[in-house]
Amino acid sequence: SVVCAAGNEGDGDYDDFEYSYPAAYVDVISVGAVNKKAVPAYFSNANLVIDCVAPGVDIISTFPNNTYASLSGTSMAAPHVTGTLALLKNWSDDVFQRELTADELYAQLIKFTKTLEYPRTIQGNGLVYLKPR
């Protein structure tokens, strides 16, 4: 599975679509951004190919010169989904005793989304959410 940031050209209008590539290509998991309260980020692209959203506002990340910075963008959200897919792949290998196909892994990812009270064009299937065991 290829995971891509949905893009930061959003204008806050969920009916005004912004497409960014490679996120808008078929078979790419397109990830939008939400803040810590699960509210879609104003800059996050809205369109018909968003697959899911993840935290992407005020994310502490590495920065040049061995420092850290608070960054915002769908590029901060996409790694959350990549990490979630890695955990699901590890888990599914144990549960199913075989390696899942990309489509099966995607279906497992979507099972771990929580639908938010916003249009599908800004959240796709919802917020990626894994409960700790």
Q: What function would you assign to each model-found segment?
A:
Residues 1-51, 58-82:
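Substrate-binding/specificity loop regions of serine endopeptidase catalytic domains
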Residues 119-133:
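Caspase-like cysteine protease fold
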